[in-house]
Amino acid sequence: MNFDLSQALRTLKPQKQNRSLERRAESELRWAADEPQLGGPILLDTCVYIDSLQGRSPHDVKNLVRYRTCHHSTVCLAELTHVFGRLDPSHPNTNSVLRIVGETIADILSHRLHAPDGMAWGSAGMLAGVLARLSSAPMGQRHDRVLNDSLIALQARAVGGAVLTRNVGDFDFLSQLLPALFVVNYRRSDRGER
C-alpha cells in the first residue's frame, strides 16, 4: 500500500483551503430527476442500498441504477455488513433483515467492487479534515462519516463516475473541495415504492 504525502498535499492543498463552506442552492446541484437514464457510470453511496431495501427509492434513482454502469465501494460494503454484528440475534426480525442484506451484497458484481488504496485513504483523511475545519464542525464530531464520504468521493473520481447519494449536504461540501467530483443527488421517496 503506497501513500505519497507530497503528492496528496500538492493535489488537495489542504492548508490553502481557507474559505468557509456554505451549502449551495439546490438549483445549483445535479439531481437524479434531471439526469438522462443513459450516461456515465455512477458509484452508489450506502443510502442508495438502504433506500432500495426499504422500498423508498424514487423512480429516477431506480432508472439510473437500472440503466447506468454501477460501481460499488468496499466502504459501503462495510457500512452494510455492520448490521451483521449490530443487530440483536434474539430480535424476531433480525434473520430476515440479514437475509435480505446478504442477498443485496451477493448481487454486487466483484469486478465493479472497488477498495480504496493507500493514496485514497491518506487523501481522504486530509479531505475530511479540511471539510471539518471549513464547515466549523466540533473536533471529532462526524469524523468517521465524513471520512467514509471522502473515500467514496475519491473512489467515484477514480472510476470516472458520479456519486449517487441523498447525502446532499456532505457531498455538496466535498464537491466544492474537489471540483472534478460529480454528484447526483436525490430525495428519498416516502411512498414506499418497490
Predicted regions located by residue number:
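Acidic, metal-binding active-site segment of PIN/NYN-like and related structure-specific nucleases
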Residues: 3, 146-193
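Short, hinge-like loop/turn segments at secondary-structure boundaries
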Residues: 87-91, 132, 181-183
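Glycine-rich, flexible loop segments associated with nucleotide phosphate handling
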Residues: 38-41, 95-103, 139-154
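Acidic, glycine-rich loop-and-strand cores that form catalytic or ligand-binding grooves
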Residues: 104-108
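Short, well-structured N-terminal submotif of metal-dependent ribonuclease cores
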Residues: 1-79, 83-102, 192
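Active-site neighborhoods of divalent-metal-dependent phosphate/nucleic-acid chemistry enzymes
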Residues: 2-6, 27-28, 82-87, 111-162
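Phosphate- and divalent-cation-binding pockets in alpha/beta enzyme and binding domains
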Residues: 79, 123, 173
